[in-house]
Amino acid sequence: MSGAKRCPDCGSSEIVEDAHYSQDQLVCADCGCILSEGLITTTVSEETSLQAVRYSDSTGENDSVTYCMKRGIIRVRDLCRVLRLPDGFVDTALSYYKQAVGLPLYRLVSIEKKEIIVGCCVYITCRQQQWPITMGTICSLIYAKKELFASLFMDIVQVLKVDVPSISLQNLVKSHCRSFKLFKDSSEVPPQYAEKLDTVSERTVQTVELAYETWLVTGRHPIPMITAAAYISWQSFQPSRRLSCSLSRFCKLSDVDMPPPSTIRLKELQETLIKLAYHLPWLKILSLNRKNIVQHLGDLLKHRALLLRRALAVTEAELSKGTEASSSTDQLNSTLVFLPPCVSNPKKRSRSIAFPCGDLDITGDEEISDSEIEQYLRTPAEMKDYQQVQSCISSV
C-alpha cells in the first residue's frame, strides 16, 4: 500500500497493487479506479525474465472440473428435468453430488455406482423437500439394481450427514394416482371407465390408510399396494360396469406398469375387507367374497375406526378365554384377525436334515453312541490314541 498517492476521483489513500496477468497495476480499493497500468514489455530481456500466468491462476479458478464430474452434473440435471423438479431442487442435488464425488470413498468407483450416486443425490433432495417419489422410480430411470441403490443411499446419507425424513404416504398416493390415464379428462378413455382424479385419490388414500392400520403396508414397497388400492377404489364407484375389468387390464388402460406383487396385495386387501365386513350388522347376512366386497367399500371406509375397534375387542375376548384352538395355525389366523403377513403366513425354512418328532429340544448333554464316535476316527494314529485312552479309563 502506498500512503503518498491518493485517488484522483475519490481522494482515498487506500491504494493497493493488483496483479493482472503478468502486469502489476495500482488500484483504488474504495472506488476501483486504476491509477497506473503496467507497462507492456518491449525488450527481449524483459520478455525472457517474465513468466506466463495461467488463466485459472489469475482468476482464482484453481479447482479443475474432471470429465466424470462434468458428466455427472449433466446427468443430475437431466434426471431432474425428467422428474420435472423445480430449479431449487437441481441446485441442492448438484451440491450433494459434488460433495459425494469429491470424497475419496467414491472417487474410484465403477461407472454403475457413479450413476447410482447421481440418483441418490436427487432422491435425497426429493425426500428432504417432501416431494413424493419412490426409490423404485429412480432405479427404473437410471437402470440400477434396487439392492445396490439402497446400500449406496444409506452410505451417502451417513457420509454426508444429511437428514432424510420419511415419505408422506398421502402425498405419494396422490402423486401415483396422477399417472393413471383413466383418471384424466381424455377422449381416449371409455365413458364407463372414466373417473375424476380427486374422487379416486381421496378414496385411495383412505384404503391405503386402512391397509397401513392392518399391517399390509409395513416393511413393503408402497407402489404395489397403492396400485391395488386405486383399482379397488375405482371399481367401487361403478361396480356393475367395472367388476369385469381385471387388474392387468386396468393398468393397461391407465397406461401404467403393473408391479408383480400387486395381485398378491389385492388379494390381501380383499381378505381384510371381508374380515371387517362381518362386524357390520347389515353385511352379516350377505354372502361376501372377493368380487362383491368392492360394492361395500364406501361403508367399510366410513366406519373403519369402529370396525377395527370391534375386531380388536373380539380378538382380545377370544384370547382371554384361553381356547385350546389357538395352537392350530388355521384357527390362529381366524382368532387373531390382523397380523403382519410375515407372522400370519411365515415362509417355510428349508432344513438339510429334518428333526425327529420330540427331539427339537437339544441341550448338548446328550450321550454319543460308539458308532457315531467311530465316524470321526479317520487315521490309525487317532485309533491308537483312542485305544490308549480307553485302556487308561478301564485301568482306573
Curated annotation (Swiss-Prot):
Keywords associated with the record: Activator, Metal-binding, Nucleus, Oxidation, Repeat, Transcription, Transcription regulation, Zinc, Zinc-finger
Start-end of TFIIB-type zinc fingers: 3-36
Cellular localisation: Nucleus
Transmembrane region(s): none
PROSITE patterns linked to this entry: ZF_TFIIB
Matching SUPFAM superfamilies: Cyclin-like, Zinc beta-ribbon
UniProt-annotated binding residues for Zn(2+): C7, C10, C28, C31
Matching Pfam families: BRF2-like_C_cyclin_rpt, Zn_Ribbon_TF
Gene Ontology annotations for the cellular component aspect, listed alphabetically: nucleus; transcription factor TFIIIB complex; transcription preinitiation complex
Description of post-translational modifications: In response to oxidative stress, a Cys-residue is reversibly oxidized to cysteine sulfenic acid. This impairs formation of a ternary complex with TBP and DNA and down-regulates expression of target genes in response to oxidative stress.
Annotated positions of the Cysteine sulfenic acid (-SOH) modification: C342
InterPro entries: BRF2-like_C, Cyclin-like_sf, TFIIB, Znf_TFIIB
Swiss-Prot/TrEMBL Sequence repeat ranges: 173-249
One example GO MF annotation: RNA polymerase II general transcription initiation factor activity
CDD domains the UniProt entry points to: CYCLIN_BRF2
GO biological process, one term: regulation of transcription by RNA polymerase III
Domain of life: Eukaryota
Principal subcellular localisation of the protein: nucleus
Function field: General activator of RNA polymerase III transcription. Factor exclusively required for RNA polymerase III transcription of genes with promoter elements upstream of the initiation sites. Contributes to the regulation of gene expression; functions as activator in the absence of oxidative stress. Down-regulates expression of target genes in response to oxidative stress. Overexpression protects cells against apoptosis in response to oxidative stress.
Subunit structure: Component of TFIIIB complexes. Interacts with TBP and forms a ternary complex with TBp and target DNA sequences.
Family: Belongs to the TFIIB family.
Protein name: Transcription factor IIIB 50 kDa subunit
